């Protein structure tokens, strides 16, 4: 059906535009805080009710708004930050479009009280749904206080998409955390339900603000970074290779003190760390990139979270070099830290191109040694000169390996109904392993490679899931309970995660302030650091659990625990362990892939192998 083109009413266009700027209460907190910082404030108080869904109030001691400009402040595209197009390429303020207050006021009730140093009295204005309701003089201190309530009342559809109160509060605290890292010289306090949630005192030392935000325990494992070219200056703090996180949530990137989510910067960080930390783990980094405003375009994203660099290669190389310099300064050369041992989870795709020749040579050398000393018999699965297994285990098993091995050799395979899964793996002829990561088997019509980490990961996932669903998870009480200090956003998220933690055998509860106490872990993972484990699980649910059901979030946790508990790439398995792995695979459903969807095994047909040698 054809319809005429019509001009949309102004109220509707304002609400559509507001949807680009105001996604959730945290968006409002961000815009109001940025306005306060742009006004030169050195003291900012934030108040949240119902996680920001009920009320948001931001009060500052900045320069205030002139009385004659108060009404204009709520007009769309009215701003004091720029006056002409070229100013966009010189802007250093957080805001410059003149959209924030207009967008916020169009979907809420907004009250603004402000006074400048030149005015004897302040001004109070109330705007609801984009319409001015009240405007009067008011007594108030120098600065601005903005109160936003009835959020999304005029846009009920958007209101339905809001999460639980604790989740929305955590989003708000995340925004405050990032802005506090960019502005250590400003005191920021946050209140909710009459109590102080967090307090960031003003400091001239960035390291003090970083320690306060991340926690002293994490900050102690960070190293300062610094690098400079003729166009770019890079500073900040970055973690040592032995301190990693489950997600990228601990990577904070700032361009000219503006928090951004930039793929180029994230890629530069991971490039510097790619050969010193294991795959699927991430460093903790607080990164500041400073350059001429003319060399970066901040007018790319409505929320100003993305930027575009005029010379991206220059920025990329400066970040990589600054981080690499820090790592080199610690005596951690890239080659010496390449992890393919017990702590790694390396995959073929993560082996650097320049390492292929040396790895192939080493594989051939080890193969020739094995052929000469052990005389492995092709196709028999036996050794002519078997080694002393107890001596071998005593020499090889250390740290986490022993728990992964116990889960292979001692844990019974999950019981399945008869004939529900055809046992094919136990019948395969084991030939050896490639890089102590991929198990090689001879089959009737070719060669089969099994990723030992992915296979064990799938086995453990099904065991953990089954035990959790039946409330039969084996638990080990910690001899000395672990007290863990969380960041305020993570502490808010902890309450949502507690039922899932209990389900998998982790006993933890609040311990006062922003601390929690961990009393027990699942036996399967009792060897892991309790604090790192719980932090990773909170991050896992925060980053990847949005919009998922409790069951789906539970499966995210099962997959994470299985990954941490499984044998690693680079971890040598003896024949008994390989045999047990095959038997467990036969009894495990969905054995073709790991919980993350990667293949467990790959078949190389004989005809393809013969074709490579031109026999066909």
Swiss-Prot record:
Give me the disulphide-bonded residues. Answer: none
InterPro entries membership: DNA_mismatch_repair_CS (IPR014762), DNA_mismatch_repair_MutL (IPR020667), DNA_mismatch_S5_2-like (IPR013507), HATPase_C_sf (IPR036890), MutL/Mlh/PMS (IPR002099), MutL/Mlh/Pms-like (IPR038973), MutL_C (IPR014790), MutL_C_dimsub (IPR042120)
UniProt GO MF annotations: ATP binding; ATP hydrolysis activity; ATP-dependent DNA damage sensor activity; mismatched DNA binding
List GO BP terms, alphabetically. Answer: mismatch repair
Any single Pfam family the record assigns to this protein = DNA_mis_repair
Does the keyword section mention DNA damage? yes
Under the heading CDD domains, the entry gives:
HATPase_MutL-MLH-PMS-like, MutL_Trans
Alphabetized SUPFAM superfamilies for the sequence: ATPase domain of HSP90 chaperone/DNA topoisomerase II/histidine kinase, DNA mismatch repair protein MutL, Ribosomal protein S5 domain 2-like
Which Gene Ontology cellular component annotation is one that this UniProt entry carries? mismatch repair complex
| Keyword terms of this UniProt record | DNA damage, DNA repair
The family line of this record is:
Belongs to the DNA mismatch repair MutL/HexB family.
Q: Which NCBIfam families match?
A: mutl
Q: What does this protein do?
A: This protein is involved in the repair of mismatches in DNA. It is required for dam-dependent methyl-directed DNA mismatch repair. May act as a 'molecular matchmaker', a protein that promotes the formation of a stable complex between two or more DNA-binding proteins in an ATP-dependent manner without itself being part of a final effector complex.
Record's protein name: DNA mismatch repair protein MutL
User: Which species is listed as the source?
Assistant: Syntrophus aciditrophicus (strain SB)
Q: Which gene encodes it?
A: mutL
């Amino acid at each position: 059906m054809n319809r005429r083109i019509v001009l949309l009413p102004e109220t509707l266009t304002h609400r559509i535009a507001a949807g680009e700027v105001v996604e959730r209460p945290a968006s409002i907190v961000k815009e109001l805080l940025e306005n306060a910082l742009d006004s030169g404030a050195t003291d900012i108080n934030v108040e949240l009710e119902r996680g920001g869904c009920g009320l948001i109030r931001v009060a500052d001691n900045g320069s205030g708004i002139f009385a004659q400009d108060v009404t204009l402040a709520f007009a769309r595209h009215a701003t004091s930050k720029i006056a002409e197009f070229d100013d966009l390429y010189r802007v250093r303020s957080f805001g410059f479009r003149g959209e924030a207050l207009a967008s916020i006021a169009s979907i809420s009730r907004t009250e603004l009280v402000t006074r400048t140093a030149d005015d004897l009295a302040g001004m109070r204005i109330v705007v609801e749904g984009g319409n001015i309701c009240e405007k009067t003089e008011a007594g108030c201190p120098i600065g601005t206080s903005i109160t936003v309530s009835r959020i999304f009342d005029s846009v009920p559809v958007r209101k339905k998409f809001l999460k639980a109160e604790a989740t929305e509060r955590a989003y708000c605290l995340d925004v405050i955390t990032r802005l506090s890292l960019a502005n250590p010289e400003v005191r920021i306090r946050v209140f909710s339900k009459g109590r102080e949630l967090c307090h960031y005192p003003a400091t001239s030392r960035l390291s003090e603000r970083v320690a306060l935000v991340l926690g002293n325990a994490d900050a102690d494992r960070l190293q300062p970074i610094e690098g400079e070219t003729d166009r770019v200056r890079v500073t900040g703090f970055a973690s040592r290779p032995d301190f990693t996180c489950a997600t990228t949530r601990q990577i904070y990137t700032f361009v000219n003190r503006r928090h951004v989510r930039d793929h180029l910067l994230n890629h530069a960080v991971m490039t510097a760390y790619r050969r010193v930390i294991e795959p699927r783990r991430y460093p903790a980094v607080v990164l500041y990139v400073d350059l001429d405003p003319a060399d970066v375009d901040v007018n790319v994203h409505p929320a100003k979270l993305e930027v575009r660099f005029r010379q991206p290669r220059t920025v990329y190389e400066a970040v990589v070099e600054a981080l690499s310099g820090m790592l080199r300064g610690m005596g951690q050369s890239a080659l010496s830290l390449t992890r393919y041992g017990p702590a790694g989870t390396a995959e073929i795709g993560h082996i650097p191109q320049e390492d292929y020749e040396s790895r192939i040579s080493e594989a051939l050398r080890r193969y020739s040694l094995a052929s000469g000393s052990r005389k492995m018999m092709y196709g028999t699965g036996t050794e002519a000169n078997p080694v002393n297994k107890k001596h071998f285990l005593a020499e090889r098993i250390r740290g986490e390996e022993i728990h992964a091995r116990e889960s292979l050799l001692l844990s019974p395979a999950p019981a399945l109904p008869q004939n529900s899964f055809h046992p094919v793996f136990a019948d395969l002829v084991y030939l050896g392993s490639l890089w102590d990561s991929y198990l090689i088997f001879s089959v009737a019509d070719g060669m089969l490679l099994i990723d030992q980490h992915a296979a064990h990961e799938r086995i453990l996932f099904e065991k953990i899931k089954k035990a959790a669903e039946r409330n039969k998870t084996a638990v080990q009480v910690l001899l000395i309970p672990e007290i863990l200090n969380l960041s305020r956003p993570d502490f808010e998220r902890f309450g949502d995660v507690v039922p899932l933690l209990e389900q998998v055998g982790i006993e933890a509860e609040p311990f006062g302030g922003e601390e929690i106490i961990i009393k027990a872990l699942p036996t399967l993972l009792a060897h892991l650091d309790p604090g790192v484990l719980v932090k990773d699980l909170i991050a896992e649910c925060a980053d990847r659990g949005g919009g998922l059901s409790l069951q789906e979030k539970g499966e995210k946790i099962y997959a994470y625990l299985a990954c941490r508990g499984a044998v690693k790439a680079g971890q040598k398995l003896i024949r008994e362990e390989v045999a047990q792995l095959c038997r467990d695979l036969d009894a495990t459903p969905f054995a073709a892939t790991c919980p993350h969807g990667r293949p467990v095994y790959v078949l190389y047909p004989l005809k393809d192998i013969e074709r490579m040698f031109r026999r066909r």
